[in-house]
UniProtKB/Swiss-Prot annotation:
Belongs to the ATPase gamma chain family. GO terms for biological process: proton motive force-driven plasma membrane ATP synthesis. Disulfide bonds: none annotated. Gene3D superfamilies: 3.40.1380.10, ATP synthase, gamma subunit, helix hairpin domain (1.10.287.80). The gene is atpG. Keywords: ATP synthesis, Cell inner membrane, Cell membrane, CF(1), Hydrogen ion transport, Ion transport, Membrane, Transport. This is ATP synthase gamma chain. The keyword Transcription does not apply. GO terms for molecular function: ATP binding; proton-transporting ATP synthase activity, rotational mechanism. The keyword Ion transport applies. CDD domains: F1-ATPase_gamma. The lineage of its organism: Bacteria, Pseudomonadati, Chlamydiota, Chlamydiia, Parachlamydiales.
């Protein structure tokens, strides 16, 4: 059995770790609250843009735009959105599992990866995939300007023909308890069907619909991409909260068990000393 000093040292170590996991849980909860607001605010905007684009498509059925172009697929870009750090349970593992399953549907030479998050870079640099672009340290550090630049770059690669399709692998945030890894096509843009059962609004477009279609389409892509990044970050934080909560709970169990062992060892030591004193006293008689 370990000595009393060793048990106390281990107990102190676990208590220190528990303080750290509690702090990380609180920080993640605070950040999640801020990101949840962004996710909630973006959804109505994306839906409304979808409705406008859908209405434009209906009244100008012959409309054409480069972002809608469907062409022979020679090069595919796959954006994989993971975390910058671990300590978030199976969050990163689930993303890589879904991404790898999707990547198997293409020949290796067809695919170029666009990696978001240090964990994605660390994972795929060890594997035989072509990496076009890496973006680390994102999360709360990512500004609106950087997101706009990133989305513009994706659209540029598609428009100049360097990539014929662009797919996104990310985590869709539903609730604190519910998250789902999604594999979703970003470009070319498919027919947009807003999830609304309301009667279509009869918009008055000024200037004419064809002139404003492209601008709204670009705005839609920007907003959609920003929304996806926010959802991924919210999912990461939610996963980290649960992981840290579980770690804190496990630390409680270990502290309880070690405290019991410490008390037993201390009691055994006291009993041993008492026996030695009693034996010594008997020997002096």
């Amino acid at each position: 059995m370990a000595s009393l000093r060793e048990i106390r040292k281990r107990l102190q170590s676990i208590q220190n770790i528990q303080q750290l996991t509690k702090a990380m849980e609180m920080v993640a909860a605070s950040r999640l609250h801020q990101v949840q607001i962004k996710v909630k605010q973006a959804k109505p905007y994306v839906v409304k843009l979808s409705e406008i684009l859908d209405r434009l498509s209906q009244i100008t059925q012959d409309i054409k735009h480069p972002l809608l172009e469907q062409r022979e697929v020679k090069k595919v870009g796959v954006v994989i959105v993971a975390a910058d750090m671990g300590l978030s349970g199976p969050y990163n593992k689930d993303i890589f599992s879904a991404a790898n399953k999707f990547l198997k549907t293409y020949a290796q030479e067809q695919v170029e990866l666009i990696l978001v998050g240090k964990k994605a870079t660390d994972y795929y640099k060890k594997r035989p995939w072509n990496i076009r672009f890496e973006f680390g340290e994102w999360g709360e550090k990512l500004t609106s300007h950087q997101i706009k630049t990133f989305a513009n770059q994706l659209m540029s690669w598609f428009l100049i023909g360097e990539l014929d399709e662009i797919w996104l692998v990310y985590t869709h945030y539903v609730t604190m308890m519910t998250r789902k890894v999604m594999v979703e096509k970003f470009l070319n843009i498919q027919q947009i069907s807003p999830k609304s059962e309301k009667s279509p609004v009869d918009y008055i477009f000024e200037p004419n619909p064809k002139q404003i279609y492209g601008a709204i389409l670009f705005n839609y892509c920007m907003t959609k991409f920003q929304s996806i990044l926010n959802e991924s970050y919210a999912s990461e934080l939610a996963a980290r909260i649960f992981a840290m909560k579980a770690a804190t709970s496990n630390a409680d169990d270990m502290i309880e068990k070690l405290t019991l062992v410490r008390n037993k060892v201390r009691q055994a030591g006291i009993t041993k000393e008492m026996l030695e004193i009693t034996s010594g006293a008997e020997g002096l008689k």
